[in-house]
């Protein structure tokens, strides 16, 4: 276990910063720049061999990432720099399904981020080769955008240079949702095209194996350094060098052996790659071709590549009768099925859904990808001679990307284009791959038995039938795995309410027995909370449709995430109904939200005091009930906090209260209207502000536990000390997203369980 956990432990500097979590600490550091990346608003400078001073303490940090402003000192790779700034640790995933920033950077050996206030170059010595490659990449990117425009130029830059800083976000999402997102990342497909293309070209010019191999390898190594040396590109580079080495030494190249050596080399360098999406997808794709390709080839009655056996004469004769198009289609389908079925586990684990048409879409897009890449490379070099010559060639690549857009849009219009299964647990993944391994074992056992039989015996037809069964079993196993994963998120025995960590804002997801509900969704300190925190959480929990989204009031920290969800329904989470307070309490923000909802096909409703939404769990038995307690019609309340929609959730003996931002005036009216009960759990109003959770309100509701949603080190000082004291005096246990991340309450109507994503059971 220590091998796989190597590098995951906090560095000494990170431990020092964690002594005051959430705070930015003033530091001074000296180190050598080894990499520079241009981002949207800042420049990321990667520094190695650093000495970091924090107060009176000094730490040696092998690698750091520093954000500097574009207008600050011009730094080059190899420079030794002295930087003053504020240091912080990377965020962990604070909701299920969210991006774990810390894990991502720790895999690269980086534990701390510094925001630079001042930068001083103390040595102008440069790494000439790396600096040249960095400048080449930057100028190449600028040329592509200048020739093709921001949209297609950014796409070509991502494909050729691995630079996604200008990649259109909607295009990236469109490709990912349709299962062709791998085309936008530098992968084995790209590296193989470039590496083998250069190698073959050099061989055709008359160079020998050794000369062509050395030259091709040197060019591909330089290219890998230029694009940032990601996991998939390193895998492709290692396998290319092994391939060329085999040619140079006159040996046969074995794909499986090459794959194993590449995996061993990368895992030895960084054991945490074993948990990296890029590593698993890159190696898994090749492993699928090696391991499952022969199984599906037998199922479709074609050749059995990778078995090391020759086809018999009758099979060769049969293949000659097939048209070239049919053979191409069968080969593409076999490859696509092999890759997708072996990668099903990582796809569900990291992306939570399966694009159902991706098998067929990849048959169309992969064969023409070399056209786009070839046009991009050739057009770039021709542009150096004359833009008038290079531009038409580059536009061939632009036309390919335009075609991809149209294919993805067409696929998105087809019914049932994606199946949201949620994030599978470890048990399901282990079971799936054990069954896959057993089916492959059965196939290879049967294949070897068949090869020992006399091919002229009548039993050969029986063998062909038997050899088709493992492939059918693999497809059935993949379907069952996907369906079982989704069904595993259904609450057969109870309901669940989760207070998401959206920073300084509010968002609560309720999963009933049959339907899904959301109460608010927004943040004032987390940008793109809808697409970065709320939607990934929902998809990871197998929620592709929200039946009711309740909006308590129109403040940005309660609705801006919902606005994102409404706009992105086509590729994200569908919203059936938007529920708002009575019309008289609407402000301009709520009216705009209603317009946005109706524009995107969502029905807008109002909920008055006394209205309720109830589920039935069979035989007329009432299940979850959400009842509106306020505001009542005709009350003298201003639109906003004090007129927040207040909801009472009941399920069996369980009671939970959601209060929006009501504060003292709204709480006073609730106490007077006589609808309040005693509650097991209170979702504290207004992030625990001073004016909320008054003594009278707590005396009436008598909550056993209070859940507070507030941002870490927020500027408002929420939750306020006075509020916490009142809650404690009322005998209430207090839990906050600041410490625990997502807070999840599960109940069967009697038993209640509470846990946080960053903490154990509470």
Task: Name each model feature, range by range.
Residues 2-182, 531-536, 545, 591-608, ...:
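Membrane-interface helix/helix-cap signal primarily in integral membrane proteins
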Residues 34-37, 278, 502:
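Feature for secretory/organellar precursors and membrane-associated catalytic proteins
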Residues 44, 92, 190-193, 231, ...:
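Short hydrophobic/aromatic residue motifs in ordered secondary structure
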Residues 55, 67-86, 97, 103-110, ...:
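Non-globular, low-confidence helical/coil segments that flank catalytic cores
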Residues 107-239, 244, 498, 548, ...:
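Aromatic-rich juxtamembrane segments at the membrane interface
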Residues 114, 168-358, 423-490, 582, ...:
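Hydrophobic alpha-helical transmembrane segments in multi-pass membrane proteins
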Residues 129-148, 155-156, 163, 171, ...:
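Hydrophobic alpha-helical segments of integral membrane proteins
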């Amino acid at each position: 276990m220590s091998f796989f956990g190597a590098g995951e432990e906090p560095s000494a500097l990170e431990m020092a910063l964690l002594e005051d979590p959430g705070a930015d600490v003033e530091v001074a550091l000296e180190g050598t720049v080894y990499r520079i990346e241009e981002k949207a608003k800042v420049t990321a400078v990667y520094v190695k061999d650093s000495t970091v001073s924090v107060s009176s303490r000094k730490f040696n940090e092998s690698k750091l990432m520093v954000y500097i402003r574009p207008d600050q000192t011009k730094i080059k790779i190899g420079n030794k720099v002295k930087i003053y700034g504020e240091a912080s640790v990377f965020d962990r995933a604070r909701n299920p399904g969210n991006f774990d920033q810390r894990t991502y950077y720790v895999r690269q050996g980086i534990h701390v981020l510094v925001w630079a206030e001042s930068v001083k170059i103390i040595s102008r010595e440069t790494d000439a080769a790396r600096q040249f490659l960095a400048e080449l990449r930057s100028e190449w990117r600028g040329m592509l955008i200048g020739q093709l425009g921001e949209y297609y130029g950014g796409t070509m830059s991502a494909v050729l240079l691995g630079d996604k800083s200008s990649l259109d976000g909607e295009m990236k999402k469109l490709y990912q949702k349709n299962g062709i997102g791998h085309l936008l990342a530098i992968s084995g497909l790209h590296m193989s095209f470039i590496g083998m293309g250069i190698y073959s070209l050099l061989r055709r010019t008359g160079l020998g194996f050794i000369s062509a191999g050395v030259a091709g390898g040197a060019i591909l190594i330089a290219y890998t350094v230029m694009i940032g040396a990601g996991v998939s590109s390193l895998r492709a580079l290692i396998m290319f060098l092994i391939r060329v080495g085999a040619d140079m030494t006159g040996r046969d190249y074995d794909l499986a052996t090459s794959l194993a050596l590449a995996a061993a080399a990368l895992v030895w360098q960084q054991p945490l790659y074993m948990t990296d999406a890029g590593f698993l997808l890159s190696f898994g794709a090749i492993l699928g071709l090696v391991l499952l390709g022969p199984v599906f080839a037998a199922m479709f009655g074609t050749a059995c590549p990778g078995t090391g056996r020759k086809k018999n004469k009758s099979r060769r004769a049969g293949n000659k009768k097939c048209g070239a198009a049919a053979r191409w289609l069968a080969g593409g389908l076999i490859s696509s099925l092999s890759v997708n079925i072996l990668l099903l586990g990582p796809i569900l684990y990291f992306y939570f859904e399966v694009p159902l048409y991706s098998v067929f879409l990849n048959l169309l897009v992969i064969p023409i990808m070399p056209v786009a890449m070839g046009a991009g490379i050739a057009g770039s070099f021709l542009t150096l001679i004359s833009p008038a010559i290079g531009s038409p060639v580059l536009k061939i690549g632009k036309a390919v990307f335009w075609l991809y857009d149209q294919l993805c849009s067409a696929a998105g219009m087809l019914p049932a284009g994606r199946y949201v299964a949620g994030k599978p647990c470890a048990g399901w993944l282990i079971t799936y791959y054990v069954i896959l391994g057993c089916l492959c074992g059965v196939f290879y056992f049967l294949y070897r038995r068949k090869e020992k039989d006399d091919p002229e015996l009548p039993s050969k037809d029986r063998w062909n039938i038997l050899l088709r069964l493992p492939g059918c079993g693999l497809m059935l196993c993949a379907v069952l795995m996907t369906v079982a994963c989704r069904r595993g998120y259904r609450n057969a025995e109870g309901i669940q309410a989760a207070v998401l960590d959206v920073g300084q804002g509010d968002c609560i997801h309720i999963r009933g027995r049959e339907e899904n509900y959301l109460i608010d969704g927004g943040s004032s300190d987390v940008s793109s909370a809808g697409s970065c925190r709320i939607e990934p959480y929902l998809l990871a929990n197998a929620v592709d449709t929200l039946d009711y989204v309740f909006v308590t009031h129109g403040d940005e920290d309660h609705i801006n995430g919902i606005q994102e969800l409404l706009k992105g329904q086509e590729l994200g989470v569908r919203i059936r109904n938007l529920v708002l307070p009575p019309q008289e309490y609407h402000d301009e923000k709520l009216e705009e939200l209603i317009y946005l909802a109706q524009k995107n096909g969502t029905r807008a409703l109002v909920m008055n005091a006394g209205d309720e939404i109830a589920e039935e769990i069979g035989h007329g038995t009432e299940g979850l009930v959400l009842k509106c307690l306020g505001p009542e019609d005709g009350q003298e309340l201003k639109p906003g906090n004090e007129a927040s929609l207040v909801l009472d959730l009941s399920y069996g003996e369980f009671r939970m209260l959601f209060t929006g931002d009501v504060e003292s005036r709204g709480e006073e009216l609730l106490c007077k209207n006589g609808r309040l009960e005693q509650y097991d759990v209170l979702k504290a109003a207004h992030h625990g502000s001073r004016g909320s959770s008054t003594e009278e309100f707590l005396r009436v509701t008598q909550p056993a536990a209070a859940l507070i949603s507030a941002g870490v080190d927020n500027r408002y000082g929420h939750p306020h000390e006075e509020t916490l004291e009142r809650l404690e005096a009322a005998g209430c246990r207090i839990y906050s997203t600041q410490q625990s991340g997502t807070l999840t309450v599960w109940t069967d109507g009697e038993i209640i369980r509470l846990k946080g994503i960053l903490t154990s059971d509470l």
